Amino acid sequence: MAEEVVVVAKFDYVAQQEQELDIKKNERLWLLDDSKSWWRVRNSMNKTGFVPSNYVERKNSARKASIVKNLKDTLGIGKVKRKPSVPDTASPADDSFVDPGERLYDLNMPAFVKFNYMAEREDELSLIKGTKVIVMEKCSDGWWRGSYNGQIGWFPSNYVTEEGDSPLGDHVGSLSEKLAAVVNNLNTGQVLHVVQALYPFSSSNDEELNFEKGDVMDVIEKPENDPEWWKCRKINGMVGLVPKNYVTIMQNNPLTSGLEPSPPQCDYIRPSLTGKFAGNPWYYGKVTRHQAEMALNERGHEGDFLIRDSESSPNDFSVSLKAQGKNKHFKVQLKETVYCIGQRKFSTMEELVEHYKKAPIFTSEQGEKLYLVKHLS
């Protein structure tokens, strides 16, 4: 039987809806489903429900505890005091947890950042998606200590992925290998696609590539560990990561991007006269995400939206919203006769639309709120 995964609440949370679950700080819970941003858990009273994933943290299993302990004994690493900003959640009497004081240090190994993380305490390190950090210490409570851009601090380990198996991995060597791969691509001229930018993009770190709307680039790599970003080369030879939803693959690919491109074609789309919500001015039926992006960028104003059939799930829908900088897309699932967006449920699509005209459909980490203002015209 599969080993059950235990998580511990980092903060109190009061359920806002029936499907959610009240939790208390330091409460132990059993993880049932972590496939979405809200995790389904079970408490000691055998009640189940959804909680925000950033309100809980995984605890190591007994098997992993044994492995860490054996490794620690082999390396001769002693117990040290854990970082004070992380709450002590493991009970000393429960041997299914690793002692929170155990850690591995002097690792000096590179890791790839999978998600953005904003430091909440002075001793934490903010992470930027797509960058590399040097892991210096690993604490058994799931927090690692590392350095980036001259800053040192703690961060949650599940926000990064290790580049290699060697604990003494050479970060400079890793960068050299990547640079060699880029040079190899330049020499061989291997181009996966030629793409054109739909709108401008300003990089937030050294690995990303700045570009303007209309720029043409060669796609030279599609990183497996970050499928939402492609490595591209501009006409001037500069290479970097670009968000793939900011570009469109040109239908008639030139052999190289040095040729003068023709602008990508985008058919004029309009509200659909067929489909589940035919006749509603916000329903565009079977249009692609790319077509929705193009229409919103060409004709829309901030807050304009449209609803389209989902490309990946035939019975579901997507809300596409014009937003400053980057448009947003929200999946709406049809479960029997109920329309679900995140944890919220609506009896009709019209009810969903009216709700998000009054309540924010998206709130950023900085507190920016986005609403459905009016349908695209």
Swiss-Prot record:
Compartment(s) where it occurs, according to its Swiss-Prot or TrEMBL record: Cytoplasm; Endoplasmic reticulum; Nucleus
CDD domains: SH2_Nck1, SH3_Nck1_1, SH3_Nck1_2, SH3_Nck1_3
Claim: Methyltransferase is one of the keywords in the record: no
PTM annotation (Phosphotyrosine): residues: Y105
Recorded GO CC terms: cell-cell junction; cytosol; endoplasmic reticulum; nucleus; plasma membrane; protein phosphatase type 1 complex; ribosome; vesicle membrane
SMART domains: SH2 (SM00252), SH3 (SM00326)
Gene3D superfamilies, per database record: SH2 domain, SH3 Domains
Post-translational modification remark: Phosphorylated on Ser and Tyr residues. Phosphorylated in response to activation of EGFR and FcERI. Phosphorylated by activated PDGFRB.
Domain SH2: 282-376
Residues the record lists as Phosphoserine modifications: S85, S91, S96, S166
Disulfide bridge partners, by residue number: none
InterPro entries: NCK (IPR017304), Nck1_SH2 (IPR035882), Nck1_SH3_1 (IPR035562), Nck1_SH3_2 (IPR035564), Nck1_SH3_3 (IPR035565), SH2 (IPR000980), SH2_dom_sf (IPR036860), SH3-like_dom_sf (IPR036028)
Keyword Oxidoreductase: no
Pfam families referenced in this protein's UniProt entry, alphabetically: SH2, SH3_1
A biological process from GO: cell migration
PANTHER family noted in UniProt: CYTOPLASMIC PROTEIN NCK1 (PTHR19969:SF16), SH2-SH3 ADAPTOR PROTEIN-RELATED (PTHR19969)
Subunit structure: Interacts (via SH2 domain and SH3 domain 2) with EGFR. Interacts with PAK1 and SOS1. Interacts (via SH3 domains) with PKN2. Associates with BLNK, PLCG1, VAV1 and NCK1 in a B-cell antigen receptor-dependent fashion. Interacts with SOCS7. This interaction is required for nuclear import. Part of a complex containing PPP1R15B, PP1 and NCK1. Interacts with RALGPS1. Interacts with CAV2 (tyrosine phosphorylated form). Interacts with ADAM15. Interacts with FASLG. Directly interacts with RASA1. Interacts with isoform 4 of MINK1. Interacts with FLT1 (tyrosine phosphorylated).
Record function comment: Adapter protein which associates with tyrosine-phosphorylated growth factor receptors, such as KDR and PDGFRB, or their cellular substrates. Maintains low levels of EIF2S1 phosphorylation by promoting its dephosphorylation by PP1. Plays a role in the DNA damage response, not in the detection of the damage by ATM/ATR, but for efficient activation of downstream effectors, such as that of CHEK2. Plays a role in ELK1-dependent transcriptional activation in response to activated Ras signaling. Modulates the activation of EIF2AK2/PKR by dsRNA.
Domain topic, free-text comment: Only the first and third SH3 domains seem to be involved in RASA1-binding; the second SH3 domain and the SH2 domains do not seem to be involved.
Protein name: SH2/SH3 adapter protein Nck1
Taxonomic source organism: Mus musculus (Mouse)
